[in-house]
Each structure stands twice: as C-alpha cells, then as structure tokens.
Amino acid sequence: MITTTEYGDVLRFDLARTIAGRGRYWTTAYFVDGIMVDTGCAHTSGELESALMERSLDRIINTHSHEDHIGGNGPVQRQRPGLEILAHPLALPVLKNPAKMQPLQPYRKFFWGWPEPCEANPISDGAVIETNQYTFRAIYTPGHSEDHLCLYEPQEGWLFTGDLFVGGKDRALRKDYNIWQIITSLKSIKGLHLRKLFPGCASVREEPQQSLEDKIAYLEDLGGRVLELHKRGWKVSAIARELLGGPMWVEIVTLGHFSRRQLVLSYLQMKSDDVDDPYPDKSGG
C-alpha cells in the first residue's frame, strides 16, 4: 500500500505491506528534485517503482540501513542502471549484502521483508549534495542505528530525519538502539535553522524546533527517572512497569525485541544478559 502527499516541492510516500486490506507498520520516503530519501520496504518496492516511473530520479540517499528504508533500493536501481545510491560508510556492507550483514527477526521479515542487494557509495558527515534547485548537507546522527544520517537543506530549512525523530512519547525501544545517542543526536540538530521536519516515522512537523525540544525534554526526563529508580535498587522489570505502563502489543509481536524493557536497559546502558529479571511483567523492586 502506498499513499502520497505533496509539501511544495517535496513529495512524501507513506508505504506499508497490505494485510487484511490495511497497511501495517508504515514507513516513509521522500522525493525532491531528483533525489529519493529512502525507499521503503521490500514489500512495497513494486508500487514505489510504478510511482517513480514518470519521474526523473538522479540518486537515492538512505538515512540508514534498516530494511524498511532500503527495501526499494535494489529494484529501483535495477530498473535504472547506474543510478547512484548514497549512504553512510557503515551502511554500505548492509546494502551490498543485507541477508548476511543484517539478519532479520521473524516480525521484520513479515512486515517489511528482505531487501535486495544494491551498489552504493559512501556519504559522510558534512558532505554536500547539490540538485538542480537545492543544496543538501548530510549530518551524522547515530543512535537509532550506527549508520544514521539526516539530510538538511539550509535555505529552505528542511530536515529529513529518517528515524531519528519519531512521533509521540516513546514507551518502548528496539534492542539495538542507543537512547543516549538518540538524545545527543536530537540535540545536535535542534540548533539548525528549521522550517519543516520530514520524519521517516511520523507526520511532517511544521513547528520543528518545538517538536524537537518537546522530544528531548521527554526523553531526558524519562531517563532521569529511570536512573533514579535504578539507584534506589529497583529491578528493570519494575522500572518498566512503573514508568512505561502495562504490556504493549508490539512486545508480543516482536517477542520482546522492541519493548519497554529494552528502553529501560538502554537508559541503563545494560544488555539483557546483565540482569536477572527477564520477564517484564514479573514482580521485582
């Protein structure tokens, strides 16, 4: 399933696998002046190819290497031989061989699918990408992944944030994210001159500074409360229940890979093997 929305010269694609007539676990990509920022998941690659058929596409820029952002790379590049794909240097091994370098849990295979390999070139922090009308700058923003980039157009005040910025108040985190790096990266972009924020997993923000300030304040406050309870001897499971509420559907679907527990562990800079209360809904604390 694919829907499009125009924001001036920026065309937004919302993409999701269709299950029982509905799109599930959406991701977002953008087209602007010959550049595609991310390409969605493998399950929607055919629809994306069709949507791009009449458009002049010069290059793809991936904000990071997760499967729901690179899934259209291979098919689109195959359709347009020689099409340049750019990504952070740490992302290139994944793009070249996704099956080997980024094994997927069952839920990720089901909702987004295995990406095809593609050929890509490196783009590092501070690199400039010029199009006919715009000049973009890559900004390294790790945390959601080690290879995460944002794309900034200073004259327009546009910032394409990939999955660095997500909407709402986070109650769960994936096991391989780093929450403190996410906060640091959010702070690094907050000082930019911004008019519009184009996220990979949220609605477009027309008041980006306020959105970023609110997100940072929430995450820092939550982190402070996690650390305080841990200092007082609370177990991870009890902290998760106290601060993040009851069980979430996503915890069941992902078998705990994306959970309240993982968010608490990330704040504590601990791994699952470091604690002895593996069940987030058992008592403790």
Give the location of each predicted region.
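Divalent-metal (often Zn2+) His-rich catalytic cores of metallo-beta-lactamase-fold enzymes
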Residues: 79, 180-236, 242, 246
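Active-site neighborhood of phospho(di)ester-bond hydrolases with catalytic His/Asp-centered motifs
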Residues: 37-40, 58-66, 85-89, 140-143, ...
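Active-site environment of divalent metal-dependent phosphoester hydrolases
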Residues: 44, 65-71, 92-95, 146-148, ...
